[in-house]
Amino acid sequence: IKDPYIYLGFQRPPGRSAFKRMIEDQDIEALESCFDRIPVKTGETYFIPGGRPHAIGPGILMVEVMEPSDLAVRFEFERGGYVLPESARFMERGLDFCLEVFDYEPLPLEEAITRYRCLPRERQTWPGGGQQFSLLEHERNPRFTLRQSVFTSESQWIGNEAFIGIVTAGSGIIDDGQERREVGPYSR
């Protein structure tokens, strides 16, 4: 994809009845007209709080971390030939309930980027070529943190907190003293 993008917050909020009609009629063009595209690059991070409407453009591989209490409402019912089952569209609560979830305040494009883009801050380095960057910390979101670890050569990750690791490039070995595992992009 030449110009990947996301939608984040309504730049031109629809009224609730107009929004309901757009969803019921699956008028994707009208839905998209409520947003401006935010160009994104590999490695960027955005923190999008619950209630803020958002969508992911084509060709983006991403990790989405959600709080267990987050509600997932789908505007679009069909994508790439897959039709979302009716029970998965509105959490079995109906469209009228789900329309109450959204923040309808206008969010100018530059404010969306400034407010919700998370700039990496170096957090620590490890011997041998490892660095960890803070992407999202408790002062911005008290429920979870998000960090990026980058290894350019053999290094030792030092930490005692639980984590989920996703390898996006390169390969390596994870050895916790009890188990040794080779990892590469998207391995399990």
What is the role of each PLM region?
Residues 1-42, 57-171, 175-181, 185:
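Active-site region of the double-stranded beta-helix
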Residues 47-50, 58:
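Conserved "cap/hinge" positions at secondary-structure junctions
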